[in-house]
Amino acid sequence: MKVVFVIPIFNDWDSLKILSEQIKKTSIKEKWNDVGLVIVNDCSTHDLDTSSKPFALKSTILNLISNQGNQRAISIGLSYINDQITDYDFIIILDADGEDKP
């Protein structure tokens, strides 16, 4: 089963790394064989540390050039999936803050 997560983010990169690990654990438990992240960076003012592998799963980061807000960032992520990723079974939308469990 292929599951794609849309995750809008604004500056909270540390929480996103934790969420990525939680998604990885959940994917093993649920036996999802293909999991991807579409991370929509809503013009964060803090840079992502790219010196190490930031996420436990394959991911695409969409960098917006201006802050669009949470809902618009989600919409952009969904549009990206519709245009670029055609072979998925489910799309799950999660905020990066870790309040929701994967």
Give residue spans per PLM region.
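Conserved donor nucleotide-binding strand/loop of the catalytic core
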Residues: 52-80
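Short beta-strand-to-loop acidic/aromatic patch adjacent to the donor-nucleotide binding site
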Residues: 85-99
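Short beta-strand/loop segment that forms part of the nucleotide-sugar
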Residues: 32-43, 63
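Donor nucleotide-sugar binding loop of glycosyltransferases
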Residues: 12-16, 44, 101
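Short, well-formed alpha-helical segments that are part of the catalytic scaffolds
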Residues: 12-28
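Hydrophobic targeting segments
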Residues: 2-7, 16, 23, 35-40
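Short helix-capping segments at alpha-helix termini
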Residues: 27-32, 54-58, 85
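A conserved acidic beta->alpha catalytic loop
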Residues: 41-50, 98-99
